[in-house]
Amino acid sequence: MKIKIICFGKIKDKNITALINEYLSKINHFTNLTIVELSEEKINNENSIGEIEEALKKESKKLIPYLENSFNVLLDIKGVQMDSIKFANSINQNLIISKDINFYIGSSHGISESIKNKFNLKLSFSELTFNHQIFRLILLEQIYRAFSILNNTKYHK
């Protein structure tokens, strides 16, 4: 099984990058995880709803190639919430049926409504809004925690 995190933009903070690399190293003891960074569409007028919608449509087209032959999880504030054990079990279920898992983090404006029905699961970690760079780190920590639970290591208490 392979896991991909598909997201928009690059990490700019060296400290966050170091922590991300630390979690990638830990996770890759359990499974193959890669991060795919797509370019975020530029928006000249942040107040233009039409321009934002057009950018989201373009970004959605970049996601389509990743949606086939995988269990696709959209990280969405309106998604279902689950605890770490249920999250680990969800990952394990896909391990059993040998499906790759793709996690999607939208751009700063989210994900186009037109593509949201293509995902197998919409998952929310909180009703809070997170910085995209920090959220990537939070997702990696939860994936590592899930594999720690599945492998009975001391990390999860």
UniProtKB/Swiss-Prot annotation:
Signal peptide start-end: none
The keyword Transferase belongs to this UniProt entry's keyword annotation: yes
UniProt protein name: Ribosomal RNA large subunit methyltransferase H
Keywords of this entry: Cytoplasm, Methyltransferase, rRNA processing, S-adenosyl-L-methionine, Transferase
Cellular localization per UniProt: Cytoplasm
Pfam families for the chain: SPOUT_MTase
Molecular function, one GO term: rRNA (pseudouridine-N3-)-methyltransferase activity
Catalytic activity: pseudouridine(1915) in 23S rRNA + S-adenosyl-L-methionine = N(3)-methylpseudouridine(1915) in 23S rRNA + S-adenosyl-L-homocysteine + H(+)
Subunit structure: Homodimer.
SUPFAM superfamilies given in the database record: alpha/beta knot
Enzyme Commission number: 2.1.1.177
Source organism of the structure: Malacoplasma penetrans (strain HF-2) (Mycoplasma penetrans)
Family indicated by similarity: Belongs to the RNA methyltransferase RlmH family.
InterPro entries reported for this sequence: Alpha/beta_knot_MTases, RlmH-like, tRNA_m1G_MTases_N
UniProt-annotated binding residues for S-adenosyl-L-methionine: L75, G106, F125, S126, E127, L128, T129, F130
Top-level taxon of the source organism: Bacteria
Chief site of localization: cytoplasm
Any one cellular-component term (Gene Ontology): cytoplasm
Summary of the function given for this chain in its UniProt record: Specifically methylates the pseudouridine at position 1915 (m3Psi1915) in 23S rRNA.
